[in-house]
């Protein structure tokens, strides 16, 4: 049931810190974006169980630390240690917009489900909302925690979750402006992910744990999923709402079953720290990237 489907070694010149998997349904194409400390991004097409390099984006002056693809699969966004956010057209490969943030102001990014806004997390604990069409900031939300490591939108776009360096998980109601704080971790929260049905929120932390919250009342549904031996730096929900994939500095990628609250499978194919893992839009494949400069694609269905 679980197997390694594709290995792309030396995909970048340096470690790969971020990846995302999107889909353009109108063109029947699946796109993968990887970002590296070599300052570059690569857009890949996943076709016939193989990775095809489409574009090598150049524009950042320092390492790329966060990437995302909009809901229509037409636009990619990247943020870098150079404090810039760049928007890329996935049909032409051209740079379309540039947003210059403050130093350490663009550590993480996330497209809104309607593709109109790009949320960015900053070192001050502020979440900025960037208009995709104008590349201008249109609003911000101040959180209690400092240094926003992770952002995730709920599927209907009404809420935005954030993870911060002091272990707080926040759920921002974008319609009312209220913020709910979930105190679940004692160390930095590196990644958050909503279930596709919007009922659950998963968080991953340096404390080696994954926690799952009820979005409605903030109740801790699963206090801890244990198994990783290092920081858990990435978490993502499967399309079935019942499974999670996590990546860790212990060099492993793990799949979790939420019903049994147990690890279902562990991939140990990377030779160094793994920084990001994401499900494909259909949920039948997983991508992972890490410091070994490799891209791994796994079959999970």
Curated annotation (Swiss-Prot):
**The keyword Repeat belongs to this UniProt entry's keyword annotation:** yes
- Source domain of life: Eukaryota
> Does Repeat appear among the keywords?
yes
TM segment ranges: none
One cellular-component annotation, GO? Cdc73/Paf1 complex
Protein name stated in the entry: WD repeat-containing protein SL1-17
**Could you tell me which residues the WD repeats occupy?**
11-54, 59-98, 101-140, 143-182, 184-223, 227-266, 269-300
Q: Which residues form a coiled coil?
A: none
Q: Which UniProt keywords apply?
A: Repeat, WD repeat
A Pfam family that the UniProt record links to this protein = WD40
* Lineage of the organism: Eukaryota, Metazoa, Spiralia, Lophotrochozoa, Platyhelminthes
């Amino acid at each position: 049931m679980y197997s390694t489907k594709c290995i792309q070694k030396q995909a970048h010149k340096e470690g790969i810190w971020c990846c995302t998997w999107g889909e353009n349904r109108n063109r029947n194409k699946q796109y993968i974006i990887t970002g590296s400390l070599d300052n570059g991004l690569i857009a890949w097409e996943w076709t016939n169980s193989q990775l095809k390099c489409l574009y090598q984006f150049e524009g950042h002056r320092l390492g790329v630390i966060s990437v995302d693809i909009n809901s229509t699969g037409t636009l990619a966004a990247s943020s870098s240690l150079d404090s810039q956010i760049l928007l890329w057209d996935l049909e032409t490969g051209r740079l379309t917009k540039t947003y210059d943030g403050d130093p350490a102001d663009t550590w993480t990014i996330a497209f809104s489900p309607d593709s109109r806004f790009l949320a960015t997390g900053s070192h001050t604990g502020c979440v900025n909302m960037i208009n995709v069409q104008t590349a201008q900031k249109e609003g911000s939300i101040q959180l209690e925690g400092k240094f926003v490591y992770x952002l995730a939108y709920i599927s209907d776009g009404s809420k935005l979750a954030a993870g911060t360096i002091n272990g707080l998980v926040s759920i921002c109601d974008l319609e009312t402006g209220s913020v709910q704080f979930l105190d679940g971790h004692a160390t930095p929260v590196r990644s958050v992910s909503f279930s596709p049905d919007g009922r659950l929120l998963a968080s991953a932390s340096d404390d080696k744990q994954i926690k799952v919250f009820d979005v409605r009342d903030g109740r801790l549904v699963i206090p801890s999923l244990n198994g990783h031996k290092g920081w858990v730096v990435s978490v993502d929900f499967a399309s079935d709402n019942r499974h999670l994939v996590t990546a860790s500095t212990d060099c492993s990628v793990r799949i979790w079953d939420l019903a049994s609250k147990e690890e279902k499978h562990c991939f140990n194919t990377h030779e160094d720290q793994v920084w990001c893992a994401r499900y494909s839009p259909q949920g039948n494949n997983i991508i992972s990237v890490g410091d070994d400069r490799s891209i791994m694609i796994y079959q999970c269905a």
